[in-house]
Amino acid sequence: MFRLWAKIWKSGRMIRDTVICNEDTKLNRTRKIFSALEEVCIEFDLSRPIWLDSNIAEFKKHDKVRFGRDNFIDEIDFNYLEIQVIEEDE
């Protein structure tokens, strides 16, 4: 099973979180990440964040990335959205 944990942070506090699960073995890792991020954005009522080169590098290194104001087209009322892969398919 693939699980992604998404958290919204504001003023140093986590104000909202969710875990998205994906059991579709036909999808590769990248598609699972984008699918989970899409579900997160729907649940949190956010526009999809833009992946900058720095976000991609951070995610490749740590399986975790933060999306701040620069990553969203719309105005956001929090400091950042953090996503982290917490379980991967074997």
Name the predicted role of every residue range:
Residues 4-6, 11-13:
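Amphipathic beta-strand/beta-sheet edge segments enriched in Tyr/Trp
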Residues 1-3, 22-23, 75:
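A structural signal for the main folded, soluble domain(s) of proteins
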Residues 7, 19, 84-86:
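Residue-level recognition of well-ordered beta-strand positions that form the cores
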Residues 34-90:
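Acidic, low-complexity intrinsically disordered segments
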Residues 14-43:
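Short, flexible N-terminal segments of the mature chain
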